[in-house]
Amino acid sequence: MRLCFILFLLLSPLISEASQHIITVKTIHEIASDILYDDANYWLIFDIDDVLFEGAEALSHSAWFERSIQGMRALGTSEQEAWDTLYPDWLSIQRQGSIKQIETAIPLLITKVQNQNKIVFAYSERKVCAQDVTLEQLAKINLSFEKANLPYTSLPSNICFTKGVLFGSEIHKGPGLQRFLDAQPSLPEKVIYIDNEKYNVLRIGEVCKQKNIPYLGIVYTASKYHPPIYLPDIARIQYLYRQKLISNEAAALLSRHRLDK
């Protein structure tokens, strides 16, 4: 009997630990039914860049920002310093640029989940200062998360939850959602998180593990199968003429005629 009791004590943390599942999909259709027919009172959380939409120009695409940070780091700048230095340029470019929806089925899925009275919101690394342009971009593709009227206590000044969008002001996903969960009067029965980067999906999984929240992480790779928008040479030309952001086609024409020299 004593041995059984000891085994129970040793195994009980494993028994009570919340489940974690990570899957990779090419299209939202592969997982839509699982989400819609999940009986749990879950939160469905979407990343924004390269999941809901992507920049339609090489310069406005998230890849330009990422590559620019990598370039500054190669010169010895810290990741945080590079991010902070480039952010004003990135924000100005977002205000000028246009966007392309990744997959038309996503708004339909969001509407269906909202009609089930379940929580759906977006979570981005973007800074609080980007909230206006972000909400404008979402409106352009007729996406609204305003139904996610979640109560919460105070948040740090660099984190903001407005109109169903959580702005984490962070280089890497995780801390923003952690603080948001800390501010909740009650936790969800489950979190379903969709992001195009696996490392972000894993980080959110760690946050949910700490909170003992069952988790389904979805690595959403649809954008990788689209024709590339970010092209370094095109982005370079667009940066030269960034006072009025030109399209990839116009930049390619300038390149062919050597008008950028």
UniProtKB/Swiss-Prot annotation:
Its main location: membrane. It is found in: Cell outer membrane. Pfam families: DUF2608. The keyword Membrane applies. InterPro entries: DUF2608 (IPR022565). It is a peripheral membrane protein. Residues 1-18 form the signal peptide. GO terms for cellular component: cell outer membrane. The keyword Mitochondrion does not apply. Keywords: Cell outer membrane, Membrane, Signal. This is Putative outer membrane protein CT_371. It comes from Chlamydia trachomatis serovar D (strain ATCC VR-885 / DSM 19411 / UW-3/Cx).
